[in-house]
A protein has these predicted regions:
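Substrate-binding/active-site clefts of carbohydrate-active enzymes
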Residues: 1-131, 156, 160-162, 179
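The substrate-binding groove and active-site-proximal loops of carbohydrate-active enzymes
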Residues: 9-30, 58, 107-122, 137-147, ...
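Active-site groove signature of glycoside hydrolases
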Residues: 52-55, 124-150, 230, 234
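Loop/helix patches that line or flank the sugar-binding groove of alpha-linked glycan CAZymes
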Residues: 213, 225, 231-234, 239-403
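C-terminal beta-strand-rich structural cap/linker in extracellular carbohydrate-active enzymes
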Residues: 407-419
Length: 419
């Protein structure tokens, strides 16, 4: 039972193998993966892979027993539109927590949920982590962690770090009410900032929500800020350059600047995003939905053009800006290590500041200070920013407050050295 031609990569059929579809030589696939790890390390980078602890392929029966699943009363009844003659009796609960025998076409009917009420499941999943860590994998992006007990992760992560202390764990956690739980109990190093920062940025771009909402999301995080992982795209979400989101790669620039420069959160880049990949192809199971399909064998147009050295002029512009901003965020000490002062509360709406479409903040480190203003409006703006003396005092700088005038392009951002 698969979705699309390739099937979901999150419907795990063997936790201890590499998909033959990813190998040049199917019979040599594990050796190829190990060589990839060595090449990556030689290049000074780390290898992070997905760990999918909540659900597996419905017909995965070589590692688990029936006690590792949730068994229901009665046979599985698949959606009629699938035309499947697959028989499963008793049915198992689906990966998205459907605890009845008739999942819908929108459910994860191709997966079954693992039973963490059974302690045996904990030990089996720990062995999966040990297997890949022993091969030199540096970290794990853990899928759908809120569907798995935080206590399991707290135990498993501590067990792995006892053997491999530098192993890194990222939590795909969506509900911001659970952020602290999966850091403090789950032991994760980084947490997706989905329902906070990402959802707010998307609402600003798509729904006209006020940029002032970003202040509340920032304040909500408190001491968790360095533990957050900002992103504008991932395999579940629509491409930011798609017609369903910002509409172009350039229109993403203010959100990119805020995601990279506002606080100390890390940032995740999804492949092709740096070229303004639009995800507007009809790709089988996924249909035309602004996403790059994970269910079918398909070409990502911008990636193909990049490999052939044929990027369009627009893609080169977007790529240059992503490269520049990523370099600033990681190599400029103000943004890599500095503190943040939010200027929104000192700047009420006026003729020269639209607090619903513009966002202003300062970053400071040692004796340097920088102003950043992002303009989410489709029109250029001449902006005046009020910087109070308290902002400079916050950074340990003795300087009077001032008003600064600057110009910001449509759907763009600007930076200004203040000290």
């Amino acid at each position: 039972i698969v979705k699309g031609e390739a099937g979901s990569p999150y419907a795990i059929r063997n936790y201890f193998d590499v998909s033959p579809a990813l190998a040049n030589n199917h019979d040599n696939r594990m050796a190829e993966f190990e060589a990839l790890i060595r090449r990556t390390h030689k290049a000074g980078m780390k290898v992070i892979i997905d760990f999918v602890p909540n659900h597996v392929f419905r017909q995965y029966d070589t590692y688990f027993t029936k006690e590792n699943f949730y068994l229901l009363e009665g046979p599985l009844v698949l959606p009629e539109s699938l035309g499947s003659d697959y028989v499963e009796n008793p049915a198992k609960a689906t990966g998205n927590d459907v605890f009845h025998t008739s999942p819908s076409i929108n459910d994860w009917y191709d997966t079954v949920k693992l039973n963490y009420d059974n302690r045996d499941t904990w030990f089996k999943m720990l062995e999966v982590l040990k297997f890949w860590a022993a091969k030199g994998v540096d970290g794990f992006r853990c899928d759908m962690v809120e569907m798995v007990p935080a206590e399991f992760f707290g135990w498993a992560i501590s067990e792995i770090k006892y053997i491999y202390p530098n192993t890194f764990f990222i939590a795909e956690v969506y509900g911001k009410k659970n952020y602290r739980r999966y850091h403090e109990i789950g032991g994760f190093d980084l947490l997706y900032d989905k329902s906070g920062f990402y959802d707010t940025l998307r609402s600003i771009i798509c729904d006209g929500a006020s940029t002032r909402l970003l202040t509340g999301e920032w304040q909500f995080l408190g001491d968790l800020q360095p533990r957050m992982l900002n992103f504008l795209e991932n395999h579940d979400e629509q491409r930011i350059a798609s017609d369903f989101f910002a509409g172009s790669g350039r229109a993403a620039f203010p959100a990119l600047a805020v995601s990279l420069l506002f606080n100390k959160a890390s940032f995740m880049l999804y492949f092709g995003q740096e070229f303004g990949e639009r995800g507007m192809e009809q790709e089988g199971f996924s249909t035309l939905d602004g996403r790059t399909s994970i269910f079918d064998y398909c070409t990502v147009p911008s990636i193909r053009r990049w490999l052939l050295d044929r990027l369009t002029v627009e893609e080169l512009v977007v790529y240059k800006e992503y490269s520049r901003l990523l370099k600033i965020a990681t190599s400029d000490a103000i943004f890599a290590h500095g503190e943040t002062f939010d200027l929104m509360y000192t700047n009420p709406d006026s003729e020269r500041f639209n607090g619903n479409r513009q966002f202003a903040f300062m970053r400071g480190y040692e004796d340097a200070c920088m102003l950043v203003v992002a303009n989410f409006d489709g029109r250029p703006a001449e902006i005046e920013i009020n910087i109070p003396s308290e902002a400079y005092s916050f950074f340990g700088i003795n300087k009077a407050g001032e008003r600064v005038r600057l110009k910001v392009g449509a759907n763009d951002y600007t930076r200004l050295n203040l000290v």
